[in-house]
């Protein structure tokens, strides 16, 4: 006779084992109809699952995040149902939940087209209208194999092979279609009405490019139509802001098939890149960092010592010369230790902060590449701080403050922080981990910012802090990291002479603020929709003449602004002034300076903004002062 304790503390007793759905019905018909699943003693279960003993129960509905994820997972199964009806020879692979949606990987003899995706979506809607129950059957392993063998689902059989210890598995039946899953899933298709398929792409079995290619169908699903409509609106806005489209339109960069994952920077884009690099160089110099430069190609032996060859070789570009193996560096850390190791250091020289705008290359799968956001060749604003254990907290606190200041300069004030602590498998004593975690937590507390604790999510060699930016669309981008490392200095024999004249290994703080220049520029493009603040804009002002008579004065203005350190250019083409204004407005130039006969006579410029505001006529010196103030505010004018 189980007694069920509900979240409000109330209890309900039953004469026999009772399902989650039955408990919901005992509370009310409305709740029963809204029940997606249950959480029994903290564990998610299906609505049909029986509770045989006393337990706590939370009814999960579409309003709960867990309920929304279950809806998305069940929508993936619905994709399978529709695909098998439309394309009977297709073989289903996996269909997990992802951020804001789901996907299903499918093996089929040809690539799916947009017409196929529309047909699949239409069939899914027809299946939902049938309002059928989703039936769960916990099935013995041998019978599961029989089911998928009879259906020629080769990939499902491979997945069963991957779980040799599982003697029974959950099979979920959508009418004639069956899928395998740990669950839980929705009890009925009525919960799946607010969905949309979003895109198609290729994928590889087990994510390995050496394996066969699959079709991936992406979709999104929400609790109701209103949420779905809001999401679609966000996606449409995001598509308008796609950095690939804006980058092409503004002439910033391009990518091409002959160099997958590599960026061709155009003059305007490289100017933007240089602004970022010069800004970060100044910031780091002012905060005690020493800039270095290390080799691109390094012998295999160093990567073996660091552990990268054993754990990361598949992601490294390698080459051979004179019977020696080399790798193009995927990260800068081992090389920075080599710089530290040149000459024995004293504790008086610590902390030592070594920074590099380090060009790295990683052999990312081609299917994962995305514009300049996910590339194979990139540059990090990388630095490593070598310090004593006693200096960990102060260095961490200083880095947190520096990082938040940098983000504010770029217009980002909504920052999410996560602290990841010790995993089960780790190096270093518990006492050292206690001190390291305490140092990071205290540094975060001193910044006065809330953070999410992620127990067990740290690296085996130390805890870490992650910094994520929220952009104008509410999207979260993980950029900065602060990673404590007790392991690499030992592996690569980094030492210093301590106060008692003994040799000790320093603690190594891996840190980056932007992450990679390429990805951060992509984020900036989408956040500002290409309309960068004046300090970042590749061209800050364009001087336009109305007729040829004003050309000489326009060139004088350009020269004056350039000598004052501004990025200005003249447009002296024989075009109507309205045409020129429109063109440079579309190119997102912050300030448009128009010169006619009156401006030449008065030695002024008529100033307009790209938003269309008329700032009136002013002397060139006054405009230069105005522009200097706009530049000095950096990205803070809209955030403070």
From Swiss-Prot:
GO MF annotation list: ATP binding; metal ion binding; threonine-tRNA ligase activity; tRNA binding
The keyword Transferase is assigned to this record: no
Ligand binding (Zn(2+)): 333, 384, 510
Example GO BP: threonyl-tRNA aminoacylation
Record's keyword annotation contains Cytoplasm: yes
Known catalytic reactions: tRNA(Thr) + L-threonine + ATP = L-threonyl-tRNA(Thr) + AMP + diphosphate + H(+)
Subcellular location(s) per record: Cytoplasm
Enzyme Commission number: 6.1.1.3
Residue intervals of the TGS domain: 1-61
PROSITE patterns registered for this protein in UniProt: AA_TRNA_LIGASE_II, TGS
Cofactor(s) required, per the database record: Zn(2+)
Chief place of localization: cytoplasm
Cofactor binding: number and manner: Binds 1 zinc ion per subunit.
InterPro entries per record: aa-tRNA-synt_IIb, aa-tRNA-synth_II, aa-tRNA-synth_II/BPL/LPL, Anticodon-bd, Anticodon-bd_dom_sf, Beta-grasp_dom_sf, TGS, TGS-like
GO cellular component, one term: cytosol
Region ranges (Catalytic): 242-533
Its job: Catalyzes the attachment of threonine to tRNA(Thr) in a two-step reaction: L-threonine is first activated by ATP to form Thr-AMP and then transferred to the acceptor end of tRNA(Thr). Also edits incorrectly charged L-seryl-tRNA(Thr).
HAMAP family for the chain: Thr_tRNA_synth (MF_00184)
Subunit structure of this chain's protein: Homodimer.
Protein name as catalogued: Threonine--tRNA ligase
Source organism of the structure: Pseudomonas syringae pv. syringae (strain B728a)
Gene transcribed to yield this protein: thrS
